[in-house]
Amino acid sequence: MMMLIRCISIFLLFGFVNALIDEASCPIGWQIASDQCVRIVIAPANLKHSKKYCHHEGGELMDTSVTLLLEDVMDLLKNLHENGLSEPTFHVGGMGQALNRTEDGNYKIITINPSSHFPFICSLNKMARRSLLFQQKLLPVGAPQISLTGQSEIYFHPRHDADYIALPCTVQGNPKPTVAWYKNDVEVLSPSMSNVSYLLSGGNLLVPASSTLAYSSFHCTARNSLGEVRSPPILLKPSFIDPFRPHRLDVYSLATGGAKLDCDAPAHQPKSLTYSWLYGSSTDRILSQNERKFISLDGTLFFSYVTAEDEDSYACSLSVYSTQSGHYGPFFRLISSTPKLVNSTFPPKLDSTQPQIFPEDPKVGDSIYLECFAYASPLPQYKWSRVDGKPIPARSHISNYGRVLKIEKVNYGDAGKYKCVAMNAFGSAAGEVHVKLRAPPSILQGLHDRLVPTESNVSFECLLSNADSYSSVEWFKDAKPIVPLLLPAEKRKRLKIDHNVLHLKFADETDSGVYQCVASNDVGSSSSSALLTVKDSAPVFPPNAMSRKVFAAFGSTVSIPCIFEASPRFHGKWADAGGSKLPQKGRIRDEEGVISIEKVLHEDAGLFFCTAHNKLGKAHAQVQLIVVNKPSIKTNFLDEETVNMSCEVELTCENSAECPEALFEWKINDRPAKEYPSLKSKVHEKKSGHKGRHLKQKVDLEVPKSLAGSRQIGRFACSSLYGGSSEFVTKPQLPSPIALTVEQMDEDGKKKKMFRLRWRLPPQHRDTRDHSPKVEGYLVELRTRKNRKWRAAERQLVGNMEKDSITVENLLPNTEYQFRVRSVESAAIGEPSIPSDWVKTAPGAPSETIDNLKWRSLDSQTLLVEWQPIEIGQESSGDNLRYRVSWSEATVGKNATDDMKLSNQDDDFENHLDSDQPQAILKLNTTEGCRMVVLAVRPVNDQGNGSVGTDTIAFLNSHGELKKVSLHNVKPINASHVNISWTWDNTSDCDTKHAVQITCINLSGSEISATVASDRIFWMLGGLEAETAYDCDLKAIDNHGSFGPASKKFRIHTKQHPPSETPLIGKLMMKQMKDTYTTILEWSSIELQKPNRTENGCGYKIFIYISETATEAIELDMPLQRLSDRRNPSARLDGLKLMYMYTIKVAGYNPGGIGPISEPRSIRLGSPGTMDYTTGSSDVPIPSLLLLLLLLLWRL
């Protein structure tokens, strides 16, 4: 039996970092492609500068030899092209190589002049990827964001009764952002203010459908501690339809024999495409279209030729959906001017308006209609084609006897000229219509978060397509417009806006915040935002960022990065144990902060030092490299039933307790041993030598007969903390399937979410004389466009399996998949096949159900219903997702849920409406007294209906009684704030509640009030005067300003004034103790409490900031009772770390709150001038504050 032992070059990089960062993700500003991270840089450069840029970012020009990487990058480029990117050529790795877009939309590698300027593509190596991910942890996360709806205009029908318009504002961030709304740039509603004219529903705003809001502009903002963003404005436009003219003249047929009746529609908004015609002087007789009669989408009625029966009276009818009304015009007569031509024949002649397109200015994503009508006798046939020779889009279909070509969801590829030909036996006529598409501006590459040091230059670019280069671009900082002319002169010099690029010079900390660009045109807006953090910090090596010891196997290659936090950031410098800097070339070298040692030798072991410094300071870290022999594998065939394999590591440590566990891991045919439950392993450890300095660690693996039959086991690999080794036991390789194809399966004529994969094995495997192992099955792997990582198909996805095919089912609808297949036998898995082409599942009905269904009564006939939206951040299951709200009404006392019990669960209640937002406003029938409404919501789309979630019962009362509210508890917090909580009366479900109003009046008559939404049961009331009594009550209030019964009055007393004086820090020094050191802080005493008052709750607060620029402090209390000398207060700060920079502030406090905070004092412990060598003459003990545990928790 032949065996091959192979050494695997495995080196220990800091494994614990894996727990700190997600190495499967890409750093900010990079995109995942296959298993790598890439950046597509649009700014053109020559080959030299492209390489320099990629190298500066920690990467290199993309390697085109990796097939999966190349395919994924091509997909990214195709997406950019579809969004408007016109650049066809990109520099990639290799001398003079580039990716070039071909006429068929694919990309191929070409050779170009290296001095030519083109965009380029960088990819990150693993070390740089890890380093950037770690450095990225310095960036604050959770800046607010607003998900755009794409709506720039909303039409509404003004009403006198209560009706509302829902304006969407979906926000994200951590901490959760607060939402405020503005009307014409004036704030109208936020969580801290109330306005009975508006309702805040989650982040969405409900405004009354009043004519006073016509042409008003609304926008929302989202704000948290990191910054603020704003949405593009939404313009409210009233829907209306004017009356038709009362009279119109009769119409005569055309000389050709046909007829054209214009609708002569009145002014209306929005423009309607819904027309019909009445005839016979009756509003009950509606004209039907046929091969001879055609109603255009602009309302025109055409006759191919006129017969005697067509001489009748006609009237045009127009309806506008958003007004839920329509009008019809006066009746008039059609008179044939050429009766002799009734039975004549003539060739087709297109009307002067034909062909035409609807809507007239189509947008990307619209469904468009191309119309073509010709006068002719006999009736003509119609034929559609594209002038450029391309096929008609697959999303199109022809209707209305060939006269209408409809194209669903048009994209830029559908633009161009279309030709219509009308033909009969006597001739033909042709015409062309040009499809020009519009769209909101497309931001090809958005802004991304940045961390920069002070005095650096920063640029943000909203990269627009060439077609959008003339769009309007506005810039905002924390939701405020950036207008250079309105800025102070100093800042105006530093800031420059060049259309879609913002330049900021010599940045300082006041420039930190959320920057946002909004690109707009007459179609809509697009927006992108990013958080800029301007911060200086001295280099710090975070705990657990670098291992104190690195173990490397003899003969392997090891790389050790210098990982630290700093701003500004430079590469760390490595030196050996003697202090000599490592060279940049050679077997042992420093590659911009990364030690690289090739073919590790035993004499390479020892200490290495990394030094990081910037203008604020310097920091050091040391790493000990320990070289060990690679693990060895021994194979012992015990009998025909069992094989025993052992993997052994031998190393020497100063103390065996310091030798880390080897952490062995076995793999069989590249799959973890834990996937083979029949395997058994056992770990041994043996010590020898003085004090156990010599250590052997061994793991045994027992392989049973089921895997060891015929001694053809496969490949066994043992890896450990110190390296790895593997053993091949002779065995023919399993063949990889070839010629993989994918067939979409149909059932009952409907496309299902299932595919049939077919393949074949290579010819040599089918010849059993080569003693190839028997293939016992196949493993299907898949990935999606959105998640490009290969993974095994779950069991529920794999259906019927045959010799050379398999069914994959239960896939997500409307999702693109790629598949590959591996051969499998009992102890081995073969290499994967070449991936299949991308295939897309058919759209389907929504599979998610609605959660968190809530309701609120707006009045006795109006309900606001809200729920959690579905399909957030994922592919939509089908077209036109919306929500169907259905309800059933009943008076209290009748079981309203009987309707649901008697009906099919898949049926809706008798009343229902569809909403494209996760809320709806229901107008109910007028009913006296109390009633309950059973509500149900299901998601639906054009492909079908989803399932109904849990029903909810709402209660309404036509008498408008408001619930009674009662005080639960009141607790003064400080001199100006008090916490109030309450409960609602539950004796009746029908009493309504919209909000609660808190009203407090002091003895001098000064009033403070606050209105709080009904879903809150507590509120912190602020703005109160110190040491003042207030009489308060609670009342329910509805959205019309009507109040319910007041609660029983209660009195509150605010606390005293906080201290008014500011402490002064006198001494901040490091002091040597007997066995250690401490930090002494002294400050001036202030008056904390008025005379003759208790000292309970009085003292000083010490604020400790780790670094000069930290924004969050550790707060420590020093109660007055703990001070040994109240006239000269001081404290010992134990647990501070050497060489760390700390900033200290002090403030006094009493039950009324915290007083003014002192000026800061900073200290770097251990630096010259920070030691206090005096012994001191006083024996008064100084109270100590232990910080070590608190600091560790703060760092975590």
UniProtKB/Swiss-Prot annotation:
Principal localization? membrane
Q: Which residues are glycosylated?
A: 100, 195, 343, 457, 644, 895, 925, 945, 974, 979, 986, 1002, 1092
Renumbered to this chain, the positions carrying a covalent lipid of the kind GPI-anchor amidated serine are: 1177
Positions of the pro-segment in this chain:
1178-1196
UniProt xrefs under InterPro entries: CTDL_fold, FN3_dom, FN3_sf, Ig-like_dom, Ig-like_dom_sf, Ig-like_fold, Ig_I-set, Ig_sub
Q: Name one GO cellular component term.
A: perikaryon
- Identify its membrane topology class: Lipid-anchor; GPI-anchor
| SUPFAM superfamilies on file | C-type lectin-like (SSF56436), Fibronectin type III (SSF49265), Immunoglobulin (SSF48726)
Coiled-coil regions listed: none
Which part of the chain is the Ig-like C2-type domain?
144-225, 232-319, 355-438, 441-533, 539-626, 631-730
Question: Could you tell me which cysteines form disulfide bridges?
Answer: 169-220, 263-316, 372-420, 462-517, 562-610, 653-718
What is the protein named? Contactin rig-6
| Organism per entry | Caenorhabditis elegans
Q: What is the lineage of its organism?
A: Eukaryota, Metazoa, Ecdysozoa, Nematoda, Chromadorea
State which gene encodes it.
rig-6
